[in-house]
Amino acid sequence: MNLPYETLQRIFRDLAAEEMSQSRGDFSISESSREWTAETTIRDRDERGAGSIGVDSLELIQLATRMSEYFGLEQFGIGDSLLRGKTMGDWCRMIHEVMEPAWESITVRSSGTTGAPKTSTHSRQNLERECRGWETLLGPVQRIVSLVPAHHLYGLVWSCLLPASIGQGGLEGQGGLEVIEARWETALRWLGELKSGDMVVGFPFRYQTLPATASTFRVPAGVTAVSSAGELGAQEWEALYRLGFHQVLEIYGASEAGGIGWRGRPEADFELAKHWQGRREELNGLPDRFEWTGKKTCRLLGRKDGWIKIAGSLVDPKAVSALISQHPLVRECSIRSNSPDAQAVQGHPSGIRLKAFIAPVQTGLSTKDLQGLAKVLRKWVEPQLPPAARPVSYEFGACIPRTAMGKEMDWNRSVDHHDVA
């Protein structure tokens, strides 16, 4: 597959934005990266923002290492050349030159916001096979409207590789379908720009605003909506169909395995994608639990590791709890999902967030004092955690709620605590 230069530039931009966001703890970088172009400088710190990524000497090596890992550049020996590149365009051109004639694999990291990310390498052959399988599910597609980052595996396949494959009649050709980036647009804006034959590539959190729109708006005929990175909630399913989407596909996938299954109705089991049929035993090592309902169908029963998917990102509640427990005013902290069914499904309702229960060091605090402590903690975690991993509510008590056997339990109105959310 010869990725168009413009596609590679999108991947580079989103990959660089994620790397710098996580490195600096500044999660506004993703927003400013929308203005990055081929002329955006790499190292000019005085112009950091839209005009420059503004890396220092250590970040420069970090960025080159991430690009080398993702695109498999070690085999091409261009590491030193990358370090000499002055602009984003310089870097993209060098990568494109070595990727264009031949490439073997792409290495992605898990979409976790907490804990150490895991890397997974996907061969060119497997990515091509996955694209061919998804094409058989789709009707005629004229354009892609992307609401997702291009560098995560779901975005890579559905907003980069699949458009290239459909538009080229195969991944060896040139060109590809037009991709409209609508990541930073409101729902009303991108809905209003849809044309017949479009395919929207999104995820549950982005579709969450649609129910309020569905009563007054209709999309053109023949438009498809695709969703992944978490369970599509019942309200979102209903809204998509009421808006007039011709086809809705919910994709189940994992960073370790790519796209695994799909369904076209909220009550349906997931059907294995064509490229996984006959190979389901290879899925046993995934972090998700399955209930097989047939040779090609399964239900998803949640993750084995207790992580929670929020707005497309995996969050480790234990890691968040450990961080907040380090604050000098906190004696104990417990973190849970605000949905009691968060571990009952593979994905989660699109409105799911984290809540925190805090046992302060100082006891006997007034409601006003606790409200002040909640503000302090919110401000303290903001630079240390990405939005998906930040608790949206704080409750306080003398000790963490536990069962008679000492196991942490969810808190409710029967527990003696103060809700200062």
Report the location of each language-model feature.
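Conserved AMP-binding A3 loop
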Residues: 105-132
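Conserved C-terminal "lid"/linker of ANL adenylate-forming enzymes
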Residues: 355, 379-421
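Phosphopantetheine-dependent thiolation modules in NRPS/PKS and related acyl-activating systems
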Residues: 1-106, 125, 407-421
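AMP-binding/adenylate-forming catalytic core of the ANL superfamily
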Residues: 287-389
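Conserved ATP-dependent adenylate/AMP-binding module captured primarily in the ANL superfamily
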Residues: 126-145, 184-198, 212
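Conserved AMP-binding loop of ANL adenylate-forming enzymes
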Residues: 136-173
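Gly/Ser/Thr-rich phosphate-binding loop
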Residues: 212-267
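ATP-dependent adenylate-forming carboxylate-activation enzymes
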Residues: 147, 168-194, 315-319
